Amino acid sequence: MHLTLAHVGARPGSKDEVDALTQVYLERCSPFARCRSEAFRTEDALMEWLQKQQGRMPAVAVLLDSRGRTMTSEIFAAWLGMRRDEGAQHIVFAIGPASGWSQTARDRAQLLLSLGPMTLAHALARLVVAEQLYRAFTILTGHPYHAGH
């Protein structure tokens, strides 16, 4: 399974400490899935990239959206496990532009996912998603990382 953590509105090459920690969590996921991070300048660029993925490795599009579904870590792990067991080859978790997702993008998504009612900076949202992906895999494999939640 391939996982991509995508975000819109990025300046090419801009990195900070939060990005470094996000990368740590994505690397921790490597025993379970191939993970990478992708930055896109615009929503249109991301949507075009997603469309191109359909020919190679069909992607499940999960858009992070304040109006989306909230999940506990356990429910998120179960959702991810179901996608894996159904044979999903590629899941893209995308953090949108500051103005929010267009209706076209929302309609294209298989899941709108909310991290909660608070607004997060894009870098922090990426970190939270990366950590929750790692946590989900540890829940699915019975690893003690989540045991003391």
Regions found by a protein language model. Give the residues of each.
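Short glycine-/polar-rich loops that comprise or flank the Walker A/P-loop
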Residues: 1, 33, 58-59, 108-110
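Conserved RecA-like P-loop NTPase ATPase core
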Residues: 5, 62, 96, 129
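Short glycine-/acidic-enriched loop or helix-start segments at secondary-structure transitions
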Residues: 15, 72-74, 102-105, 124
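S-adenosyl-L-methionine/SAH cofactor-binding core of RNA-modifying enzymes
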Residues: 29-92
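N-terminal beta1-alpha1 ligand-phosphate binding loop
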Residues: 1-29
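Short glycine-rich anion-binding loops that position phosphate/pyrophosphate groups of nucleotides
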Residues: 11, 66-69, 97-101
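Short, glycine/charged-enriched secondary-structure capping and boundary segments
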Residues: 18-22, 75-79, 107-110, 127-128
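Structured adenosyl-cofactor binding patch, chiefly the S-adenosyl-L-methionine
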Residues: 104-149
